A protein has these predicted regions:
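A charged, aromatic-enriched C-terminal amphipathic alpha-helix characteristic of glycosyltransferases
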Residues: 255-288
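Short hydrophobic beta-strand element within catalytic cores of glycosyltransferases
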Residues: 215-224
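Conserved donor-binding/catalytic core segment of Leloir-type glycosyltransferases
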Residues: 135-156, 162-165
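Active-site proximal beta-strand in glycosyltransferases
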Residues: 14, 55-60, 71-91, 106-109
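Donor nucleotide-sugar binding/catalytic pocket of nucleotide-sugar-dependent glycosyltransferases
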Residues: 89-90, 102-135, 141
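Acidic donor-binding loop of glycosyltransferase active sites
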Residues: 188-201, 214
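Short N-terminal targeting/anchoring amphipathic segment
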Residues: 46-66, 82, 192, 196
């Protein structure tokens, strides 16, 4: 949102509930309990926003009013619309289950891995504000800190991370249950970051780690890597690993402070090229301009 505002766009963030993830939201509906009361609150919000909004950019498969009505209503009102999928909201779903999104003016996914489920979507990676993140290169120490921050141990493959680190001379730090500010301070102390071992692509946690200049290990689908490198003209610096190969992928980083530093620097440069919020804002504005 801040990157759009820096480009003189009157952008507002509206959420259903504020939670810890979006303390910066301009408006939280703080929806009441009960389906009918929630629907009424959302209809009222839509009625308030419609006259003053040119582009409705929805996230995570959520809309203000029922999906069957949301996009036809916006089109009738002469408003532009975008449905921005984040990954877990589409992963494994059939084309029929996602057919409703074809009514939006455009669809966005954050990676070429997610494009498997929405082939006609624009691929616009997540952006972060790099002006607020100074690199903290990995430390030159014999026993490096491996950091892992699972939102779900099962989905992220945490038990395999624990088992792999037990075979290496490292200090494993698992970050859980903290607000983002406190968690981010711990990210700064890492020498190596392990994201996840199941999903096939990386998320915001890995992007933040790379922005800090940390080498990142996670599981990546080969085809998504190829398409990403073709689209952006830069090599994806993340080391891909599975449950079975994690130890061998970590070992060179554990044994070589120089390799940790080299890969960390390359990772920061990659984020500057692919994930800078100002670059992403320009891509969004280009998409908005092309909507009918």
């Amino acid at each position: 949102m801040q990157a759009l505002r820096r480009k003189d766009v009157d952008a507002r963030l509206v959420v259903f509930e504020r939670y810890q993830l979006h303390p910066e939201a301009d408006w939280s509906l703080d929806r009441p309990s009960g389906l009918a009361a929630r629907q009424l609150a959302q209809w009222r919000a839509f009625a308030k926003l419609a006259p003053r909004t040119d582009v409705f950019h929805f996230y995570f498969g959520l809309t203000l009013v029922p999906k069957s009505l949301q996009f036809p209503l916006l089109r009738a009102l002469g408003k532009k619309s975008v449905m921005h999928f984040l990954g877990s909201d589409i992963r494994g779903k059939s084309p029929h289950e996602l057919e409703w999104a074809q009514r939006a003016g455009a669809r966005i996914v954050g990676s070429y891995d997610a494009a498997r489920w929405v082939p006609d979507a624009e691929v616009i990676p997540p952006g972060i504000d790099l002006s607020e993140i100074d690199p903290v290169p990995p430390a030159d120490r014999e026993r490096p800190v491996v950091l892992h921050a699972p939102s779900s141990r099962r989905r992220k493959g945490t038990e395999a991370v624990i088992a792999a680190c037990a075979q290496l001379d490292v200090e494993l730090q698992i970050v859980e249950g903290l607000d983002h500010r406190k968690a981010f301070e711990l990210y700064r102390t890492a020498d190596i970051v392990v994201d996840q071992l199941n999903a096939g692509w990386y998320g915001v946690f890995a992007i933040e780690a790379m922005a800090l200049g940390k080498p990142v290990v996670t599981f990546l689908h080969d085809e998504a890597v190829r398409r990403t490198q073709e689209a952006f003209g830069v090599e994806v610096p993340i080391l891909s690993a599975t449950h079975e190969t994690l130890v061998e992928r970590l070992r060179p980083l554990v044994e070589s402070p120089e390799e940790r530093g080299r890969l960390g620097a390359v990772s920061r440069a990659y984020v500057e090229h692919v994930h800078d919020a100002d670059v992403i804002a320009d891509r969004l504005l280009d998409l908005y301009a092309r909507l009918s």
